[in-house]
Amino acid sequence: MAAGPRTSVLLAFGLLCLPWPQDVGAFPAMPLSSLFANAVLRAQHLHQLAADTYKEFERAYIPEGQRYSIQNAQAAFCFSETIPAPTGKDEAQQRSDMELLRFSLLLIQSWLGPVQLLSRVFTNSLVFGTSDRVYEKLRDLEEGIQALMRELEDGSPRAGQILKQTYDKFDTNLRSDDALLKNYGLLSCFKKDLHKAETYLRVMKCRRFVESSCAF
């Protein structure tokens, strides 16, 4: 009998709850396919969380008539644009797994500081009650990417810190128009960067483990 939606949800939840292996030489070792599955699920969850947060913040604070012009002004705002990383799936497929993991790690680490104030921006719980857990979720994904890097270590030189700048922290003064625009821009970059990290992880998973979900 084919697995139903409930089975799929339970499986996904189970994978999200699995801990990352702290020692790759420990027994029993987690299969590489499971490491990738865990990382992809976590990245998808964070990307969706970021997209939902952006939309709800926009709906609550940004007048509809101003959204398009503000979004255009945000086009070159993200510091992550200074990273020579692939901009989409096709470009990502031209890079090695280790390169994609390093880019993913840089993107995740650039947000560890800024998101620590994210829960204060959403004191009224605009879209989700777990905004105070975003930092922990990012650290969890960081740990998963590092576990994959240990597994796939190929002896190539480690990349230095490419990101020269990082993001400002979210502003909790929501009575200021400047603060609102700053937070709106940060949420836009957060969404874009997590989409990149998710894309890189999915490309790696798909080319190592051919599956029907590779079409994305």
From Swiss-Prot:
Gene3D superfamilies: 1.20.1250.10. GO terms for cellular component: extracellular space. The modification Phosphoserine is found at S131. Residues 1-26 form the signal peptide. Its main location: secreted. Keywords: Disulfide bond, Hormone, Metal-binding, Phosphoprotein, Secreted, Signal, Zinc. GO terms for biological process: animal organ development; growth hormone receptor signaling pathway; positive regulation of receptor signaling pathway via JAK-STAT; response to nutrient levels. It comes from the Eukaryota. InterPro entries: 4_helix_cytokine-like_core, Somatotropin, Somatotropin/Prolactin, Somatotropin_CS. It is found in: Secreted. The keyword Lipid biosynthesis does not apply. Zn(2+) binds at H45, E198. GO terms for molecular function: growth factor activity; growth hormone receptor binding; hormone activity; metal ion binding. Disulfide bonds join C78-C189, C206-C214. Plays an important role in growth control. Its major role in stimulating body growth is to stimulate the liver and other tissues to secrete IGF1. It stimulates both the differentiation and proliferation of myoblasts. It also stimulates amino acid uptake and protein synthesis in muscle and other tissues. Belongs to the somatotropin/prolactin family. This is Somatotropin. It comes from Equus caballus.
